[in-house]
Curated annotation (Swiss-Prot):
UniProt keyword terms in alphabetical order: Cell inner membrane, Cell membrane, Ion transport, Membrane, Transmembrane, Transmembrane helix, Transport
Record bears the keyword Ribosomal protein: no
Subunit structure: Homodimer. The subunits assemble with antiparallel topology.
Periplasmic side: 50-57, 103-105
Protein name, entry field: Guanidinium exporter
């Protein structure tokens, strides 16, 4: 259950990371409320997952999901670069997340 909660927390990190772009420095109300809410819920779920997962593993997986998710969102929705080096780097992050999951009992 902790891993599911951690994945949800990571996905919410993507929401708030991408949401920051749409807040325009927190000058737009709706995107700002959505972004701050996603931040709070993401952090709360991360803390909950850390009750039974190693801190380093949980934090690395959370940030990894956020980084990969934000980059993929940027590529797919925002027209950001999808060059081979960037995609290979994202794949390495995903492999690292899988490795951390497999090495945690």
């Amino acid at each position: 259950m902790s891993w599911i909660i951690l994945v949800i927390a990571g996905l919410l990190e993507v929401v708030w990371a991408v949401g920051l772009k749409y807040t325009h420095g927190f000058s737009r109300l709706t995107p700002s409320v959505i972004t701050v809410t996603a931040m709070i819920v993401s952090m709360a779920l991360l803390a909950w997952a850390m009750k039974s997962l190693p801190v380093g593993t949980a934090y690395a997986v959370w940030t990894g999901i956020g980084a990969v998710g934000a980059a993929i969102t940027g590529i797919v929705l925002l027209g950001e670069s999808a060059n081979p080096m960037r995609l290979a780097s994202l794949a390495l992050i995903v492999l690292g997340i899988i490795g951390l999951k497999l090495s945690t009992h």
